[in-house]
From Swiss-Prot:
UniProt name for this protein: Error-prone DNA polymerase
EC number of this enzyme: 2.7.7.7
Keyword RNA-binding: no
GO terms (BP aspect): DNA repair; DNA replication
Lineage of producing organism: Bacteria, Pseudomonadati, Pseudomonadota, Gammaproteobacteria, Vibrionales
One of the record's GO molecular function terms: nucleic acid binding
Entry similarity comment: Belongs to the DNA polymerase type-C family. DnaE2 subfamily.
Naturally occurring in which organism (per UniProt): Vibrio campbellii (strain ATCC BAA-1116)
Matches recorded under NCBIfam families: polc, PRK05672.1
Amino acid sequence: MSYAELFCQSNFSFLTGASHAEELVLQAAFYRYQAIAITDECSVAGVVKAHATIEQHKLDIKQIVGSMFWLNDECQVVLLCPCRKAYAELCRIITNARRRSEKGSYQLSEWDLMSVRHCFVLWLPTHQESDHYWGRWLQQHHAHRLWVAIQRHLGGDDDAYTTHCELLANEFQLPIAACGGVLMHAVERLPLQHVLTAVKHGCSVDKLGFSRLSNAERALRPLNKLSRIYKSKWLEESTHIADLCEFKLSDLKYEYPTELIPNGYTPTSYLRMLVERGKKLRFPEGIPADIHQTIENELALIEELEYHYYFLTIHDIVMFAKQQGILYQGRGSAANSVVCYCLEITAVDPRQISVLFERFISREREEPPDIDVDFEHERREEVIQYIYKKYGRERAALAATVISYRFKSAVREVGKALGIEETQLDFFIKNVNRRDRTQGWQAQIIELGLQPESLKGQQFIQLVNEITGFPRHLSQHVGGFVISSGPLYELVPVENASMEDRTIIQWDKDDLESLKLLKVDVLALGMLNAIRKCFQLVEKHHQRSLSIAEITRLQDDPHVYRMIQKADTVGVFQIESRAQMSMLPRLKPARYYDLVVQIAIARPGPIQGDMVHPFLKRRNGEEPISYPSEEVKSVLERTMGVPIFQEQVIKLAMVAAGFSGGEADQLRRAMAAWKKNGDLAKFKPKLIDGMRERGYDLEFAERIFDQICGFGEYGFPESHSASFAVLAYCSAWLKFYYPAEFYTALLNSQPMGFYSPSQLIQDARRHGVEVLPVCINHSSYQHHLVQRPNGRLGVQLGFRLVKGFNQESASRLVERRPSTGYRAIQEVKQILRNRRDIELLASADAFQILSGNRYNARWAAMDSLSDLPLFNHIEEPMANYQAQPSEYENLIEDYASTGLSLSRHPITLLEEAGKLPRFTRMKQLVEKEHNSLVTVIGVVTGRQSPGTAAGVTFFTLEDDTGNINVVVWRATARAQKQAYLTSKVLMVKGILEREGEVTHVIAGKLIDCTHNLAELKSKSRDFH
C-alpha cells in the first residue's frame, strides 16, 4: 500500500505543531510515504524548509504545498495546490485573510473560500450540526475539487465521527480521503505538544482538561498501522490527490522590476552607461588597465546571468538616499565588485583591498548576489517608504525573521507549563551562565536546585532542549526587501508587521536563498547617523563642510592612529569593544589597511584558527615570513603569510588546491554552516589532494584545512572589514579633531554602540569636554553645543536624557520658553499641565536654576494653589527648605532619572563613607609593576564575552578616574558565578598586565560590593 499525508502542521502553526518541517519530511520519507503536505494554519512559512530538506537529502518523497483554515470557527478546510495558478490563489487567500486582521491572527471570509478556482479543498467535518450547512455550501462552490477528509485518532468517538463523515460524503456525493491531522513527527513529541497547548491557553499542563491531546495518534504513523485504521480506498484516494498535485516550489520564478530602464535603453546598455559615468567620477585621474578589465569581466558576467535589474534596483535606492542627504554605505561581498564601486553603492576603492568577484557572483552559484546597504538608522524609514511608494504594497514587502525560543523564554514557558514556581524560574535564568561552554545549562540548573531524579526535573530538561529553536512568531527582517515585477502575493503571502506602514512576507532570508529569490537589504547603522550629525555640528560651529569621502581622502593621520594605538577608542566604530581594545596596542594600526586587518583579526575565526599570534609575531619582526609558492604569496602577502580573511581562504582553495570559483564559494558556505552540520569534512580530500598534486607538503595542506575549520562560522570577509574600516577611521578622526561635536552626535544617536550615555559622558570629560546638566532654561530635547567662558565648546545635555519625558512635551517647553528663561516652576506647570512631566523634570534636577535643589522643586510641583488662574503670574521667591538632599541622595536620583550623574563618582562617595577597603584607582595602575598584585573597585558598565575558544569575559569597571579593563577566565567565572553575573559594584583582586600604555587586570577574586550602593540604578551592557 501507499499513502500521502495531506494534512500536516509543523511548528509554524505556532503553539500547535510540535515538530520542525524538516523533521516531518524526514520521518515521512523514512515511513515511505508517497507524499506529504505541509499545511500550516493560514501560512506557508514552513514549506520552503521542507523543500530544502528534500533537496538536500535527495528524499524520495513528494511535497505538496497547502494550508489549513477555519471559517467562522465552524468550517475547517485544507487547501492544496495542484498547479502554479492554485499556488498563487492560495497565497492571495492567505494574504487577504492576514491583512484584514491584526498581526498574529487571520480572518477568512466566505468570499475568500468561494473565490477558489484552482486549489483542491479538503473538508474536515467538526461533528457538529453545522456540518450539514457547510457541506452543502462547499459542495455548491467546489463540487469537482472537494473531498471529505477523515481523521482517525483512536479516541472514544472515532467510530461515531467516522460514520458521521461517511454520511456527509454520501449526502453530498463527495469522495473520502484519509488524513492524519498530524502535529508531530514522532510520538515522543506528545509532552512538548502538551506544553505548547498549555502556553497557548496560559495555564499549566495539569489544567488543560479536554484541550489536551488524549494520545499520540497525531504523530506520523507507519503504513502498516494506517492500513489497520483506514479503509484501503481512503488511503488510495490520498495518493490519487497527491498524483494530481504537480506544483513544486522550484517552479517559482522571480521576475525583476523593469520600470527603471529609460526609453531607448536596454538593461545592458543602461547599466553600462551608469558604470561608465560612475568610473569617471571614481577614477578622475584615469582608469587603470586592470580596473578597466575587471569592470568588463564583471559586466559580462552580470549580462550572462541576467542580473542587470538587481544592480539597477540597488543603484536607484542609493541614489534616492544621496539626493535626500541620507548617509549610506554598501558593504559585505558587494565591496568585491568594481561595478558596485562605480555605481556608488560601495565606498571602498578596489585598489585598497584584494578584490574577489567570485565572493560576490559566480556562475556555479546560480543565485543572485547579495548587496547589503547601511543607511542612517533614524532616516532609514524614508528609504523604506520610498521603496513602498515606488513599487506599491502589492509588489514590495520586507522578508520575515523567525523569532525562536531561546534559553530564557524556553525555561520560562516550559517551567510555567510544568507548574514550576516563577520565582524559581527567575532564579535559574539569572544565575545560569550560558557562555560557559564546558558546563551545560542542565548541570548548572541542577546545581541551582533542580531535582534531576524527579519526573518533573527530567521532563523540564528534555522539553527545554526540544522547544529551544522552535519558532514563536514571525517578525520583520532588519531590512531585507523583496521587490517583484508583478503582485508579490502571487509569489508568497504578505501579512501585516507589528510596525505601522510595514508588511512582511511569510519567508525568511534562508527561504529566499533556498529558492534563489532576490532580496534587497536596506539596513540601519547608528554610526552613520552619528557621523552625519557630527558633520552638521562641525559645519554649524566651524563653517567646515565634511564628508566621509573627504576624510578618507586625507592621508593617514599619525595623530589619529596614535590615539587608536593607545586604545582610546570609546565610541569609535568597530574598534571600541574590549576585545578590540586589547588587540589595538599589540597590532598598532598605522594606516587604513591595518584597520581592515584589526577589525577582522579580533574575531573568533582568526583566534580559533590560531592565526593571531603568528601574525603579530611576524608584524613585530619576531618570526620570519615565508611562502611555499608564489601563488600562495600572491594571496597571503598582504597579511604576512597568515590567512585572516574569508576571501583569502577561498583564494587559497583556488590557487593551491585547484578549486573553481564556484567550488570555492561552496567551501565558504560550508564554513558558514560548519557549527551546524560539519559539512567541511567533505571538502578535505579535494583540498588535501589538490594541494599535494600541486607540490605542497602534507603538513602545509593539513594546517590550511585546520585553519579553515578554525574559521568555522566566524570567518570575517575582507570586503566587510574594508567597509567598516572606512567608518572606523572616520569616527576616530572626528573624535580626535572635534571631540565635543563627536560626543554630542553620539549622545543624540543613542541607543547605539557599546557604551551607555553615562560612559560616553565620562569619556568626554576625560578628554576635556565640559558637560552641563539638564536645565529647564538651557536644554533642548536634543543635546547641543554651547560656547563656554574659556572659548571652548561644551555639551549641554538635553531633555531626551530624562527617563519618561517625551519629545512632544520637551518641544512645547522649548517653543514657549521666554527669551529670558522661566522664572518659576509655576510657569512651566501652565505649559505642561501634566504633573507627571513636572515630577520627572524635578527628579532630574532640571529646575535647579529655579528651586535650588530637587526637593524644593518637588514641593513646588505639588503646590496646587499656584495652579489656580488668579495665581498664575505670582513669582514666589526661591524656597529654601531646611531639608536638603545629600550628595549621596542626589547621586542615586541622578542615576534613577537620567542614567548618569555629573556629580562626584559613586566610588568617591563610597570611599569617603568608609565603605571600601584600600584599592588602586585606574590612574594609579600606570605606577604599578607588570605582573603585580592589585585590588580595583568600580561600577560594572559592561561584560563582553567574545565567542573565542579561550572562554574569556572582558569586564569594564568604572571608577572615579577612568575605565578599568578586567579579564575574567572561565574557571574564575564559574567558581564565583554570583559576583560574575549579577554584581553592579565589583571589587577585583588580580594580577596587573601592561602592554605599552594599556593595562588590564587578570581577575583572581571577584567580590560583589553592590550592597554598599544597592539603590544605584546603573545598568551594564552585558554579553551583547
